Curated annotation (Swiss-Prot):
Keywords: Keratin, Repeat
Chain's role: In the hair cortex, hair keratin intermediate filaments are embedded in an interfilamentous matrix, consisting of hair keratin-associated proteins (KRTAP), which are essential for the formation of a rigid and resistant hair shaft through their extensive disulfide bond cross-linking with abundant cysteine residues of hair keratins. The matrix proteins include the high-sulfur and high-glycine-tyrosine keratins.
Keyword Repeat: yes
Region called 11 X 2 AA repeats of CG, residue ranges: 4-72
GO cellular component term of the entry, any: intermediate filament
Origin species: Homo sapiens
Family of this protein: Belongs to the KRTAP type 28 family.
Protein name: Small cysteine and glycine repeat-containing protein 9
Biological classification of the source: Eukaryota, Metazoa, Chordata, Craniata, Vertebrata
Note: Human have a similar number of genes as other primates despite the relative hairlessness of humans.
Amino acid sequence: MGCCGCGSCGCSGGCGGGCGGGCGGGCGSCTTCRCYRVGCCSSCCPCCRGCCGGCCSTPVICCCRRTCSSCGCGCGKGCCQQKSCCQKQCCC
């Protein structure tokens, strides 16, 4: 959606619309990533899956790590966490 979830992946504009067509290159070197708006997923924020399912339908805090496991706090599988779900920023 022209929106970048991870500012250090080649998009200086961050999630404010300066990303154009997305980051493209992925987010391998990033440790944290935030989807600021609904539908703000791109290849720069591959964490928007699991209990969120595809591109985020609700604003979430994401983890960019490839492998994730349940954090054991009711979030279910995957690494997308509702803001009200866990105290931790990332569960993986």
